[in-house]
Structure formats: C-alpha cells, structure tokens
Amino acid sequence: MSLSTEAKAKILAEFGRGENDTGSTEVQVALLTAQINHLQDHFKEHIHDHHSRRGLLRMVSARRKLTAYLKRTDAERYTALIQKLGLRR
C-alpha cells in the first residue's frame, strides 16, 4: 500500500525546498496525504480491513500534528500547503 518511487519523486520535486529535501514539513504532509488518498481508495473495495484502517488513522493523526506545527511556526507556508493539497482547515 505504499507509494511508488516515481510518485514519491514527483511529490519531492513539487513540495521540496531543494533537490534532496525529504524531511521538510511540507514534504512529509504531502507524502502522508498521498498515502491517505491511496488508502481511501483501498477501503472502498475492502470495507472490513480494520488492520489497515488503524494505520490510516495513525497517518491522519501524524498529518494533523505536522500541519498544526507548520501553522504554529509559519502561517504563510501553512496556508499555501493547505491550498495546494486541497485540505480542509
């Protein structure tokens, strides 16, 4: 259920600050969002997959914490990221 290498590279190129930026908050939130969207499609077919649903909830929680951190530290980057990813806030 993980993302392909090409998908990760595309996200890194779009949201990263530099060529090898894999740890910035924007990149982490974008990767989590892609994984969450992928899992949502999985759950449409596999309704009773509770083990993966727990992983999904952990990812959503991690994304929420990272976005809260970004909002607290740099509100401009936060609003730009939320608009770019199409998240509710």
Swiss-Prot record:
What InterPro entries does the database record attribute to this sequence? Ribosomal_uS15, Ribosomal_uS15_bac-type, uS15_NS1_RNA-bd_sf
Provide the gene name from the record.
rpsO
Quaternary state and partners of this protein?
Answer: Part of the 30S ribosomal subunit. Forms a bridge to the 50S subunit in the 70S ribosome, contacting the 23S rRNA.
What is its biological role?
One of the primary rRNA binding proteins, it binds directly to 16S rRNA where it helps nucleate assembly of the platform of the 30S subunit by binding and bridging several RNA helices of the 16S rRNA. Forms an intersubunit bridge (bridge B4) with the 23S rRNA of the 50S subunit in the ribosome.
Q: Which GO terms describe its molecular function?
A: rRNA binding; structural constituent of ribosome
Stored PROSITE patterns: RIBOSOMAL_S15
Any one GO CC term of this protein is:
cytosolic small ribosomal subunit
A Pfam family of the record is Ribosomal_S15
Protein's name in the database = Small ribosomal subunit protein uS15
Q: Which SMART domains match?
A: Ribosomal_S15
Task: Check the record and name the Gene3D superfamilies matching this protein.
Answer: 6.10.250.3130, S15/NS1, RNA-binding
PANTHER family the UniProt entry points to: RIBOSOMAL PROTEIN S15, BACTERIAL AND ORGANELLAR, SMALL RIBOSOMAL SUBUNIT PROTEIN US15M
Keyword Ribosomal protein annotated: yes
Classify the source by domain of life.
Bacteria
Q: Name one GO biological process term.
A: translation
